[in-house]
Amino acid sequence: MPLNEIVGVVGNLISKGYIKKQSVIDALMSVPRHKFLPKNMEEYAYIDSPLGIGCGQTISAIHMVGIMCEELDLNMGQNVLEVGTGSGYQAAVVSKIVGESGKVTTVERIPELFEKSKQVLSELGYENVEAVLGDGTLGYLENSPYDRIYVTASGPNVPKALFEQLNDGGIILAPVGSHFQTLMRYKKTNGKIYEEKLLEVAFVPLIGENGF
């Protein structure tokens, strides 16, 4: 991995206040983003921008991955669900933060992206990540309940199934909206859901039974 490039990007995110937690900094520094991109896009891997990965999908900008990890308040040992694997990059970053005692289940609906991301995650040794082919808007009941759930595509609302599969005290992070989207954080406390608007964002549409 071109260390000087990722050091520059992460240093910039720290100086702008996007990322603060050492665990997030360490994870972003250690995951080789270029490995999750098509060969013809590898040279752009450490530009802090979303990039196309095929099938009409994108890999999120590095700052957005960092912000989401910060806002999820990730810690070692947590059980995490990712809705929308895409390239697999964000699942890899999250897996570094939750560590070997934690687990990341990531669900992708597009077979081509599922196969590619599963292969890369396996080759790079992310053993605490389980890749699943399916409709992420239904969650993934088999590995629930989850301490943290995050969605990497924007839907009209957060699917009910995700709240049902969330532990009490757990957090869901999801972009909501169509043309104008807001990154929302939901916390379940004593069975009640409390929501908070974080920032305006731009994600691909959430497709599925409980999406668009």
Swiss-Prot record:
Q: Which residues form the active site?
A: 60
InterPro entries, from UniProt? PCMT, SAM-dependent_MTases_sf
Q: Which domain of life, per UniProt?
A: Archaea
CDD domains per record = AdoMet_MTases
Q: What GO biological process terms are annotated to this protein in UniProt?
A: methylation; protein modification process; protein repair
A GO CC annotation recorded here is:
cytoplasm
Top-rank EC class of the record's enzyme: transferase
Question: What is any Pfam family matched here?
Answer: PCMT
Q: Does the keyword Kinase apply?
A: no
Q: Which reaction does it catalyse?
A: [protein]-L-isoaspartate + S-adenosyl-L-methionine = [protein]-L-isoaspartate alpha-methyl ester + S-adenosyl-L-homocysteine
Which EC numbers does the record give? 2.1.1.77
> Annotated Gene Ontology MF terms?
protein-L-isoaspartate (D-aspartate) O-methyltransferase activity
**Where does it reside?**
Cytoplasm
- Check the record and name the PROSITE patterns matching this protein: PCMT
Arranged from A to Z, the UniProt key words for this protein are: Cytoplasm, Methyltransferase, S-adenosyl-L-methionine, Transferase
Protein biosynthesis found in the keyword field: no
**Described purpose of this protein according to its UniProt entry:** Catalyzes the methyl esterification of L-isoaspartyl residues in peptides and proteins that result from spontaneous decomposition of normal L-aspartyl and L-asparaginyl residues. It plays a role in the repair and/or degradation of damaged proteins.
HAMAP family in the cross-refs: PIMT (MF_00090)
Family (UniProt):
Belongs to the methyltransferase superfamily. L-isoaspartyl/D-aspartyl protein methyltransferase family.
Q: Which PANTHER family match?
A: PROTEIN-L-ISOASPARTATE O-METHYLTRANSFERASE, PROTEIN-L-ISOASPARTATE(D-ASPARTATE) O-METHYLTRANSFERASE
Q: What is this protein called?
A: Protein-L-isoaspartate O-methyltransferase
